[in-house]
Amino acid sequence: MAQRDTGGGQQRTGRRDDETAEAEVEESGASDLKERHEKLSEDVDSLLDEIDDVLEENAEEFVKGYVQKGGQ
């Protein structure tokens, strides 16, 4: 009986290449995500610092405005 070559060896190599490519994409995606997270964290920290500065300067006005609007 004749045996057929299904090219299985090439498919295995293709899978390894695909896995390597996927790993590279995941690594670059993870580094992009990390950079984005750091940038957003810096932005949030900056905004919170700005809010703190405003509250320190205008704390009394802030409290009066809050109470007048129905805050407790």
UniProtKB/Swiss-Prot annotation:
Q: Where is the composition biased (Gly residues)?
A: 1-11
> Hey, which pathway is this one from?
Protein degradation; proteasomal Pup-dependent pathway
Q: Residues bearing Deamidated glutamine?
A: 72
Q: Which domain of life is it from?
A: Bacteria
Query: Where is this chain compositionally biased, Basic and acidic residues type?
Result: 32-41
Gene Ontology terms describing biological process: modification-dependent protein catabolic process; proteasomal protein catabolic process; protein pupylation
Q: Which UniProt keywords apply?
A: Coiled coil, Isopeptide bond, Ubl conjugation pathway
Acidic residues: bias regions: 19-29
PTM field: Is modified by deamidation of its C-terminal glutamine to glutamate by the deamidase Dop, a prerequisite to the subsequent pupylation process.
Annotated GO MF terms: proteasome binding; protein tag activity
Region Disordered, residue ranges: 1-41
Q: Where is this cross-link: Isoglutamyl lysine isopeptide (Gln-Lys) (interchain with K-? in acceptor proteins)?
A: 72
Q: Which residues form a coiled coil?
A: 22-61
Q: Name one Pfam family in it.
A: Pup
User: Quick one: where's region ARC ATPase binding?
Assistant: 28-66
Question: Which family is this sequence assigned to?
Answer: Belongs to the prokaryotic ubiquitin-like protein family.
Q: What does this protein do?
A: Protein modifier that is covalently attached to lysine residues of substrate proteins, thereby targeting them for proteasomal degradation. The tagging system is termed pupylation.
Q: What is known of its domains?
A: The N-terminal unstructured half of Pup provides a signal required to initiate unfolding and degradation by the proteasome but is not needed for pupylation, while the C-terminal helical half of Pup interacts with ARC to target proteins to the proteasome.
The subunit structure is:
Strongly interacts with the proteasome-associated ATPase ARC through a hydrophobic interface; the interacting region of Pup lies in its C-terminal half. There is one Pup binding site per ARC hexamer ring.
Q: What is this protein called?
A: Prokaryotic ubiquitin-like protein Pup
Native organism: Parafrankia sp. (strain EAN1pec)
